[in-house]
From Swiss-Prot:
Quaternary organization: Homodimer.
The species this protein was found in: Brucella abortus (strain 2308)
Similarity field: Belongs to the PRA-CH family.
Binding-site positions, Zn(2+): C72, C90, C97
Compartment list: Cytoplasm
Upper classification of the organism: Bacteria, Pseudomonadati, Pseudomonadota, Alphaproteobacteria, Hyphomicrobiales
Cofactor, free-text remark: Binds 1 Mg(2+) ion per subunit. Binds 1 zinc ion per subunit.
Annotated EC: 3.5.4.19
Annotated protein name in UniProt: Phosphoribosyl-AMP cyclohydrolase
Pfam families associated with the record: PRA-CH
UniProt main location, coarse: cytoplasm
NCBIfam families membership: PRK00051.1 (NF000768)
EC category: hydrolase
Recorded catalytic activity of this chain's protein: 1-(5-phospho-beta-D-ribosyl)-5'-AMP + H2O = 1-(5-phospho-beta-D-ribosyl)-5-[(5-phospho-beta-D-ribosylamino)methylideneamino]imidazole-4-carboxamide
Keywords recorded for this protein, A-Z: Amino-acid biosynthesis, Cytoplasm, Histidine biosynthesis, Hydrolase, Magnesium, Metal-binding, Zinc
Length: 119
């Protein structure tokens, strides 16, 4: 069984089951994992709001879990999902939460829009 940290959470890495794109990184507590396994729909624990959250419940972009794996230490999960609706995963309306690239130039670090993500 997965190993939760001292806060009762486990990191969840989420990718698109079709093309493997990294969509988001979230956290699950025991209840979120149980609900995910029971329903086949991804549930997470919001650390900022301190509440359970069914991803896509408001937007209609539910995440149906196709496959769930754990790493060798059993302290991280990998969810391969199909996203319902028009497909965004990020609260900004983008497909992936990883749409910004960290670049370093001339000793300065900046965030830029990644060229492989929609605006």
């Amino acid at each position: 069984m997965p190993r939760f940290d001292a806060s009762g959470l486990i990191t969840a890495i989420v990718t698109d089951a079709r093309d493997g794109e990294l969509l988001m990184v979230a956290h699950m507590n025991e209840e979120a994992l149980r609900l995910t396994l029971e329903t086949g729909i991804a549930h997470y624990w919001s650390r900022s709001r301190k509440t359970l959250w069914k991803k896509g419940e408001t937007s209609g972009n539910l995440q149906s879990v196709v496959e769930l794996r754990t790493d060798c230490d059993q302290d991280a999960l990998w969810l391969k999902v199909h996203v319902a609706g028009d497909g965004p995963t990020c609260h900004t309306g983008r497909r992936s939460c990883f749409y910004r690239q960290v670049v370093s130039s001339g000793g300065k670090v900046a965030l830029t829009m990644a060229s492989d993500h929609d605006q």
